[in-house]
From Swiss-Prot:
Function description: Removes N-terminal dipeptides sequentially from polypeptides having unsubstituted N-termini provided that the penultimate residue is proline.
Xref: SMART domains: PepX_C (SM00939), PepX_N (SM00940)
Disulphide-bonded residues: none
Gene (UniProt): pepX
The protein's name in its UniProt record: Xaa-Pro dipeptidyl-peptidase
GO biological processes: proteolysis
Family: Belongs to the peptidase S15 family.
GO molecular function: aminopeptidase activity; dipeptidyl-peptidase activity; serine-type peptidase activity
Active site: 349 (charge relay system), 469 (charge relay system), 499 (charge relay system)
Binding partners and assembly: Homodimer.
GO cellular component terms, semicolon-separated: cytoplasm
Pfam families in the record: Peptidase_S15, PepX_C, PepX_N
Organism: Streptococcus pyogenes serotype M2 (strain MGAS10270)
Length: 760
């Protein structure tokens, strides 16, 4: 374990003493440091009628237990404080450590003993993570140190778990959206699942916009998947034009219906544990699946601003600007009289994507988004540089396939009976509009590109993204983060994992940082919390997070690739082609081992190479035919210890998100030896070699200069490392699988790898 503590708010002595007193700690500025520490420790054992017993189970020195120490005349020293602090946080002498000083250095322990600062040390200790993954104060509250009185209690600028999660209100409302996406002449209704504490205080809301939450249709999804085996089409030379079109909602009328009291209820919905954490701290949770999902009406428009509007309508309702009904019969309306109107959205992948889309509307009431692994341009999710390009792990998927997966109205037999014919018509229109044949950008994709509206974002923004996420690739967050207005508060956590959540990782206090931010933004707490704009997980060692100023630098280093002419054959033998098509993982293994069709260049680094931004391959290339696709991957190659990309569970249920509520495992990325690490990758149709909107011809056997931008990253390579460049054509995971008989030739003497370099 290593501390990377970003959430602690430096506190004055007077404020620290006041907050400790509010928690019931009997500390006195006139007492000695030793007496105050003893009083603090005894309070920790509030379950015991006699605190001597648990105190005797701690050691103050290697030869003295804590009870004996406090009964002695010995003075409090750094050695004693450190040893007791470690034990209070759950670290066991002789098991987790033998030498406390060395262990504290390894932990990067954030508290440095000064006898005159004991009150502040105790305050800081309570806000510090235990071995279990919870802060000490959260651990104590979870054990019942504070009663669940359904009111707010704060410590170090963060809300504590004092809301009763055993008596939650679970209710359903149906919000009227200014849409008619299925064109049936009726405004669409949006189902909203609400979970909130029983409190007299107006509550802020965490909203998870999740098209998955009302169920998914995996059978329809699998039937809709496309075969990747097809020839790369030769496109006609042309210029692509699109236009920015404002989304115009339909008119709605003020509702004059009586207020209803009897709301639909529910017993369970699959929740997000970060939401659960905040539910216990006085934040209502709502789950919304939007148009075209079970319980709602309309068509699944998948990514456009009509879908976004269906979530926006819910924020409007929370602020009194839209109508919600108690049921589909629309006999009674219901108002969000429990809400304070301020909303933060949460969730990963599609969920985070909807958060980004919502933010670009500038809707009043949306105070903050926490968007994890989020898409900012749907074209860049299903296409790349004029190519059909599947997200990592999902060959054959496209946006209409996702529509089939998430159009959960068809899971309700009655809805299927009444609406499936119309749904199939609209789905067919969507399939035609996305143009899987060419892979080109068009108006359909432009209408699903949130980057063009990034300037309208006015809420606070928190993004998390994995630099090993080849599903929602790093370009998605790179482009939206760098497009955000300079006037807003923005934060980015870049980790070394893949498409995963990070709120329950041991090495970073993400939950607590979000708590401090949300208390600021949604509860109006003046806590003086300041979070760095960008925090990056160091790839060279375990559990080390660093502040960074920018994602993408203008300083570059050009690396020569060699002097040879290298030939890349596109064609595989029939058996090999079929084998790779059945198992793209076998293809990846062969590719990285130098066995698949490829041109391979290894560069031994003579100095450190701190990459920050978008690597570009500038290549001199020619094709034997009038078509060609180019794929590239950059590897950190050779056996050494690296971070894994999937977090593993260190404990099974040590994190309590409330008071015995929604327990979850503590996780972390492992650090272990492997043979290589993908740093970046990229794909291009050579007919789109100059830009996305220009379709050009490929002259047979004529040299072309190609600039292939790869996925942005921050990655530190060290002197002596090997940077492996792999150039090839068909990628069996991502691209169409064209087995036609053509070849590319690369002139390495006229080619370079252009690397953005991080400044010191």
């Amino acid at each position: 374990m290593r501390y990377n503590q970003f959430s602690y708010i430096p506190t004055s002595l007077e404020r620290a003493a006041e907050e400790l007193k509010e928690l019931g700690f009997d500390l006195d500025l006139q007492k000695t440091a030793k007496a105050n520490l003893e009083s603090f420790l005894r309070k920790l054992f509030f379950h015991y009628p006699d605190s001597d017993y648990p105190l005797s189970h701690l050691i103050a020195k290697n030869d003295m237990d804590a009870l004996s120490f406090f009964q002695s005349e010995q003075e409090l020293s750094k050695e004693v404080f450190d040893l007791l602090a470690l034990q209070v946080l759950g670290f066991i002498p002789g098991v987790d450590f033998t030498e406390a000083d060395a262990f504290l250095d390894k932990l990067a322990f954030p508290i440095h003993f000064d006898e005159t600062e004991i009150i502040k040390h105790i305050h800081h200790l309570l806000a510090t993570r235990c071995k279990s993954g919870m802060t000490l104060i959260d651990d104590l509250v979870s054990q019942g140190m504070l009663t669940m009185d359904n009111d707010y209690h704060f410590f170090n600028g963060k809300s504590l778990a004092t809301f009763d999660t055993s008596q939650l209100i679970r209710e359903v409302v149906y919000v009227e959206a200014p849409l008619d996406t299925d064109q049936d002449g009726q405004l669409d209704l949006i189902k909203v699942n609400i979970i909130r504490p029983q409190s007299q205080k107006p509550l802020p809301t965490l909203m998870t916009p999740s098209p998955y939450h009302q169920g998914i249709n995996e059978v329809a999804n699998d039937k809709k998947l496309y075969r990747m085996e097809k020839e790369l089409v030769v496109k006609k030379r042309r210029q692509i034009t699109v236009e920015d079109r404002d989304f115009i909602p339909l008119e709605t009328q003020p509702c004059k219906l009586p207020i209803g009291q009897n709301l639909e209820s529910f017993s369970y919905i699959n929740s997000y544990s970060l939401n659960d954490y905040f539910l216990a701290r006085g934040f209502a949770n709502i789950y919304v699946s939007g148009v075209g999902t079970a319980g709602s009406t309309g068509f699944m428009t998948s990514g456009d601003y009509a879908q976004i509007e269906s979530f926006k309508a819910v924020i409007d309702w929370l602020n009194g600007r839209a109508t919600a009904y108690t049921s589909h019969s629309k006999n009674h309306q219901v108002r969000a009289d429990w809400a304070n109107g301020l909303v933060c959205t949460t969730g990963k992948s599609y969920l985070g994507t909807m958060s980004t889309g919502l933010a670009t509307t500038g809707v009043d009431g949306l105070a903050m988004i926490i968007a994890e692994s989020a898409i900012s341009s749907w074209y860049n999710y299903y296409r790349e540089n004029g190519l059909v390009c599947s997200p990592g792990g999902y060959p054959g998927e496209d946006l209409d396939v996702l529509t089939e997966l998430t159009y959960s109205r068809n899971l309700l037999a009655g809805d299927y009976l009444r609406h499936n014919d119309r749904y199939q018509e609209l789905l067919n229109q969507q399939s035609q509009a996305l143009d899987r044949q060419s892979g080109d950008y068009n108006q359909f994709w432009h209408d699903r590109n949130y980057l063009k509206n990034a300037h309208q974002i006015k809420c606070d923004v928190v993004y998390t993204h994995g630099l090993q996420d080849w599903n929602v690739k790093p370009r998605q967050v790179y482009e939206i983060f760098n497009a955000l207005p300079s006037t807003i508060n923005k934060h980015l956590f870049l980790h070394q994992g893949e498409h995963v959540y990070m709120h329950n990782w041991q090495s970073i206090d993400f939950r607590e940082s979000m708590n401090a931010l949300l208390c600021q933004k949604l509860l109006g707490l003046a806590n003086d919390f300041s979070l760095p704009e960008m925090i990056w997980q160091d790839n060279t060692c375990p559990q080390n997070w660093q502040e960074r100023k920018v994602f993408g630098t203008s300083t570059i280093k050009e690396l020569d690739l060699g002097q040879e002419l290298l030939l890349i054959d596109n064609h595989y033998g029939e058996d090999e082609f079929k084998a790779y098509g059945k198992d793209f993982r076998a293809f990846k293994a062969a590719l990285f081992e130098g066995k698949a069709n490829q041109a391979l260049v290894d560069i031994l680094l003579e100095e450190d190479l701190p990459i920050n931004g978008e690597i570009v391959l500038q290549l001199k290339v020619k094709s034997s035919e009038n078509k060609g696709l180019l794929s590239a991957q950059i590897l950190d190659y050779g056996k050494k210890k690296r971070l894994g990309d999937l977090p593993i569970a260190l404990t099974q249920s040590s994190i309590d998100n409330g008071q015995n509520f929604s327990r979850e495992p503590l996780k972390e990325l492992p650090f272990r030896e492997d043979s290589y690490r993908v740093i970046s990758k990229g794909f291009m149709n050579l007919q789109n070699r100059n830009n996305l909107s220009s379709i050009e011809t490929i002259p047979n056997n004529k040299w072309m200069t190609v600039r292939l931008p790869l996925q942005p990253t921050i990655y530190h390579l060290e002197k002596g490392d090997t940077l492996r460049v792999i150039l090839y054509t068909t990628d069996f995971e991502h691209t169409v699988r064209d087995n036609s008989n053509y070849a590319l030739t690369i002139d390495l003497s006229q080619s370079q790898l252009i690397v953005p370099i991080a400044s010191n």
